[in-house]
Amino acid sequence: MFDGNPGRRRLVLASGSPRRREMIAGLGCEFSIASADIDESVRPSEAAADYVERLAKEKATAVFEARGDQQDIVVLGADTTVVAGGDILGKPVDFDDAKAMLRRLSGTWHEVLTSVALVAAEGCKVTTTLSRVRFRELSEQEIQRYWDSGEPADKAGAYGIQGLAGSFVERVEGSYSSIVGLPLCETVVLLKEFGIKIWSD
């Protein structure tokens, strides 16, 4: 897609997520951070895949359009959501909300979708991955203690697989890094298409 000089392109991460920051840093990319303030509400009848793709695009586009150096940057936006029984489980608003989500995930399979969007002067490209996770049965005490840890408050589906909730997981099908918040394999392919260097370049 990009046919210019890759050395002059700078990556901007449109995310305040420490997890995504660590994962991008792990790819050996030089990057800056600029969080996007967008409405993350689900639209009526919006499918989960459409929802995460839209938010990833909107995050990247909002940061890109606010910049004055658009010819020199590539902006990466990402979004992750959890889907149970066809319903989108966003970030919990309080303990009761988190408890309801975790009860719903207990002992069952659910889906995790992550979209990554790259926006640059020449356009936008997005990729979406779907993974499946199965939780063991959770006790009420575990749910309460997990909430008390503070970990679920800012996470889709009220859990983070890379933290304490890793002990809830019986099986994973798909991309572990995507469940954490950034599908690394797919992200590297996009970065290379846009002329962004990683550790192996």
Curated annotation (Swiss-Prot):
Site (Important for substrate specificity) location in chain: 19, 80, 162
GO cellular component terms attached to this protein's record: cytoplasm
UniProt-listed Gene3D superfamilies: 3.90.950.10
Designated name of the protein: dTTP/UTP pyrophosphatase
BP terms from Gene Ontology: nucleotide metabolic process
Family named by the database record: Belongs to the Maf family. YhdE subfamily.
EC number annotated for this UniProt entry: 3.6.1.9
Location(s), subcellular: Cytoplasm
Keyword Cell membrane recorded: no
Stated role: Nucleoside triphosphate pyrophosphatase that hydrolyzes dTTP and UTP. May have a dual role in cell division arrest and in preventing the incorporation of modified nucleotides into cellular nucleic acids.
Active site as annotated: 79 (proton acceptor)
Cofactor(s) needed for function: a divalent metal cation
Keyword terms of this UniProt record: Cytoplasm, Hydrolase, Nucleotide metabolism
Superkingdom of origin organism: Bacteria
MF (Gene Ontology): dTTP diphosphatase activity; UTP diphosphatase activity
Principal subcellular localisation of the protein: cytoplasm
Native organism: Hahella chejuensis (strain KCTC 2396)
Pfam family, one: Maf
Enzyme class: hydrolase
Catalytic reaction list: dTTP + H2O = dTMP + diphosphate + H(+); UTP + H2O = UMP + diphosphate + H(+)
InterPro entries: ITPase-like_fam, Maf-like
